[in-house]
Amino acid sequence: LEKDIETLLNGKKIRINKYNSRTRKINNSTDTIFAGDNNVIILDGVIALDNKYIRDISDHTFFIKIDEKKREKRFKLFYKDKSISEKEINNLYRCRNLDEVPIVLASEFYAKKIIEMDF
């Protein structure tokens, strides 16, 4: 990750593997990313603030807060749109609450700006 970010900031291309949000695994296919002359890179991810390197090089960091009921509804709609069964969605939601959500909530501490999302 650190090497790829440095490469982008130096104006060079990187190749990254695609991520399958349904299986939570990396695909064999890749994408090419190029930032060009820009000195801005936006890293969007639920655990981005958990990475010390990212925090150290970032001028701006944001944490998006949302009511848990709204987050659950959005989560379930997201996976329903992918034609995943309700049983699978509920299981995935439970698993994420155990292995991912605690890390995400703890990362709020590192954000320079907290944004309350109410939709």
Would you name each region that the model predicts?
Residues 26-78:
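ATP-dependent NMP and nucleoside kinases share a basic, alpha-helical "lid"
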